[in-house]
């Protein structure tokens, strides 16, 4: 009986009536198996009598398989290489605890359905480029507890569905820029226990926009790396490091973070506003550190914070922790003993912080060490109003002229509160003019100090000029306004602008000055300036203005003399450029003239050597036409002068310049040769005194000149 052969595509089969039971089983297996695709690593099913590749359910000898070979476990088999006969329908492959050292290119290329690959606890020191090619379904890749010294960035190509990557406990020394940008689909990244890690690039985590969990615990970190790119991060593990200080901005951009673990991190100080960026934080673990106190209202911006672990810290219970006791009572009223115990002073040692109240301490309101001062600036400049205290355990807020309360983290377009309490203006406008109040708060109360910010409008005429000043000076600030960015100083002068009216002398009562509007700005002082009152326990100093006017200049070296020097340089440059253009023009004219003269000289030199002169003796009565048409000279017969009516025939005119002398001599001999004695002809003596006319004819083809002598 013929047998049915099924391999990738249907072949002619026997009629159902003649088909045996094994053949029917093979047919059903083919119908319900995945179709073969070109290059896809399909399964070839053959009957017992036919040849072909191993069946799909075959399992490597060193491994154990289950669930129809979809789970292959090859742990603790001392494998030095990845087995080559892993079934193509494998979804879970465990190769842990072997001796594999190198993962070679295309090792798993045929495992298109593989979802979980475990290679941890091997001796892997090298992963070749393309080692994970052909794994479009891979979801989890475990490489922890190996010997990798670098992040195998190139090997992660084409892992479009990778969600989890485990690199924990490898001797990795550095994490370069864009180390994981080839796997933007990552949700969990474990980089814990990298005990030889020395460097993390600022752009190491760029591209991980979908990351939810990051483990950087026990990596000997001294500073928190840049995590700004992890905009969707929800859980961050930083335990087991050496983070002595937590600074403001350490968690910038982590607005989605819900859980932060900082246990056993040797944290001794947390600065004011350090957690302000963690708007979504729900759980914070600060246990087992070296914390003695926390800044006032550190947790106030964390509106979603529900669980805080503060145990096993040497808390010093004084006025600085009193706010924490109140916060714990409000946040976790049912369990105020969950979190921390006092370590000092001795009278409160062992008491829970949540049980403390104000009766245990004698507290005082904070002191402002550096209060804000009045400031005069020009529109468009930067400005700062400082308000500093002697301790970081206080909170600093600002009240603006329109009643808005500014805190650290409550950013506006141009105004923000820095972590040290400074109110920063990046670009002031006239509308910013007014009184600003600094409020410093601790558990005992608050202290306020006020200062006035005067913003002057820019005079377009003054701003457009080099110095930006009007007559009489004092306008240098206008032109230099564009060069000032951060700090300004107030400069006073007793000089009165021409045409300005003298101001009335001030009274003994100090009042803040009005906006600076002198002649340089093209405007006068307003009739009345808004008074600035200070209701503070530590009042801010007020600057008196005994002078006629005040204006601001930048602290940079942009002065009027510097601007004049710049004008001189520009003028000198223009003069040099003009001279260069004039010299170039004169040189061009001289070159053209020289060229023309040289051309004329060459033309004259060309015609000169080609000219020759022929002297022809012609008769006075000889017509011009006859003289030209004479072809040969007539011979003189007999004696000279015989036949006086006969005419003398001229010799033929030759053009040979080389025989010129010969022809002239012949003509002379023909005329005087008939009288050997040198006498005259038959005409008589009168004929001898009359010379025959001579014709000078130039040999040049261009010019012909005739002269009678």
From Swiss-Prot:
The chain crosses the membrane at residues 575-595. Residues 313-365 form the LRRCT domain. Residues 1-38 form the signal peptide. The keyword Cytoplasm does not apply. Residues 528-544 have a biased composition (Low complexity). Residues 366-454 form the Ig-like C2-type domain. PROSITE patterns: IG_LIKE, LRR. It comes from the Eukaryota. This is Leucine-rich repeat-containing protein 4B. It comes from Rattus norvegicus (Rat).
């Amino acid at each position: 009986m013929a047998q049915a052969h099924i391999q990738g595509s249907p072949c002619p089969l026997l009629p159902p009536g003649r088909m045996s039971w094994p053949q029917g089983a093979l047919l059903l297996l083919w119908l319900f198996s995945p179709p073969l695709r070109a290059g896809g690593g399909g399964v070839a099913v053959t009957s017992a009598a036919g040849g072909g590749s191993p069946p799909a359910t075959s399992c490597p000898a060193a491994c154990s398989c289950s669930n129809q070979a979809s789970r292959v476990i090859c742990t603790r088999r001392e494998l030095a290489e990845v087995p080559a006969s892993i079934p193509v329908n494998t979804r879970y492959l465990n190769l842990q605890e072997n001796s594999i050292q190198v993962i070679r290119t295309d090792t798993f290329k045929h495992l298109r359905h593989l979802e979980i690959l475990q290679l941890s606890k091997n001796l892997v020191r090298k992963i070749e480029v393309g080692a994970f090619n052909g794994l479009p379904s891979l979801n989890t890749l475990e490489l922890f507890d190996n010997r990798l010294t670098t992040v195998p960035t190139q090997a992660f190509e084409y892992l479009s569905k990778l969600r989890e990557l485990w690199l924990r406990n490898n001797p990795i020394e550095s994490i370069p820029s864009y180390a994981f940008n080839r796997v933007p689909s990552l949700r969990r990244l474990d980089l814990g226990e990298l005990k030889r890690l020395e460097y993390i690039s600022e752009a190491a985590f760029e591209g991980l926009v979908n990351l939810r969990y990051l483990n950087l615990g026990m990596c000997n970190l001294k500073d928190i790396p840049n995590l700004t790119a992890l905009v969707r991060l929800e859980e961050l593990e930083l335990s087991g490091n050496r983070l002595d200080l937590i600074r403001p901005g350490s968690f910038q951009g982590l607005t989605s973070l819900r859980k932060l673990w900082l246990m056993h991190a040797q944290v001794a100080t947390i600065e004011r506003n350090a957690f302000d960026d963690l708007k979504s934080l729900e759980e914070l673990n600060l246990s087992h550190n070296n914390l003695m106190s926390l800044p006032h209202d550190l947790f106030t911006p964390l509106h979603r914070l529900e669980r805080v672990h503060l145990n096993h810290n040497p808390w010093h219970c004084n006025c600085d922790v009193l706010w924490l006791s109140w916060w714990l009572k409000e946040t976790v009223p049912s369990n105020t003993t969950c979190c921390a115990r006092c370590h000092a002073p001795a009278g409160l040692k062992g008491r829970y912080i949540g049980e403390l109240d104000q009766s245990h301490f004698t507290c005082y309101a904070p002191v402002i060490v550096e209060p804000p001062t009045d400031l005069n600036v020009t529109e468009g400049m930067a400005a700062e109003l400082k308000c500093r205290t002697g301790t970081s355990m206080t909170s600093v807020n600002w009240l603006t002229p329109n009643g808005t309360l500014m805190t650290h983290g409550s950013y506006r377009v141009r105004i923000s509160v820095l972590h040290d309490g400074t109110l920063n203006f990046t670009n002031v406008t006239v509308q910013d003019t007014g009184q600003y109040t600094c409020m410093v708060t601790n558990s005992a109360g608050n202290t306020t100090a006020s200062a006035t910010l005067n913003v002057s409008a820019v005079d377009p005429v003054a701003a457009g000029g080099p110095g930006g000043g009007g007559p009489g000076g004092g306008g240098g600030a206008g032109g230099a306004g564009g060069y000032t960015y951060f700090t300004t100083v107030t400069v006073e002068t007793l000089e009165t602008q021409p045409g300005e009216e003298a101001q009335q002398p001030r009274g003994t009562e100090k009042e803040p000055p009005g906006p600076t509007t002198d002649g340089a700005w093209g405007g006068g002082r307003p009739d009345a300036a808004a008074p600035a009152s200070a209701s503070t326990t530590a009042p801010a100093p007020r600057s008196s203005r005994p002078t006629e006017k005040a204006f601001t200049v930048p602290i940079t070296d942009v002065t009027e003399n510097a601007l004049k020097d710049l004008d001189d340089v520009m003028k000198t440059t223009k003069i040099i450029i003009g001279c260069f253009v004039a010299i170039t023009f004169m040189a061009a004219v001289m070159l053209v003239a020289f060229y023309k003269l040289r051309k004329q000289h060459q033309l004259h030199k060309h015609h000169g050597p080609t000219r020759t002169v022929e002297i022809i003796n012609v008769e006075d009565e000889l017509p011009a036409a006859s003289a030209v048409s004479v072809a040969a000279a007539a011979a003189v017969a007999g004696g000279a002068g015989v036949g006086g009516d006969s005419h003398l025939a001229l010799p033929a005119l030759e053009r040979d310049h080389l025989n010129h002398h010969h022809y002239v001599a012949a003509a002379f001999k023909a005329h005087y040769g008939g009288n050997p004695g040198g006498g005259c002809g038959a005409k008589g003596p009168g004929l001898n005194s009359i010379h025959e006319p001579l014709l000078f004819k130039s040999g040049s083809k261009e010019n012909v000149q005739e002269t009678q002598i």
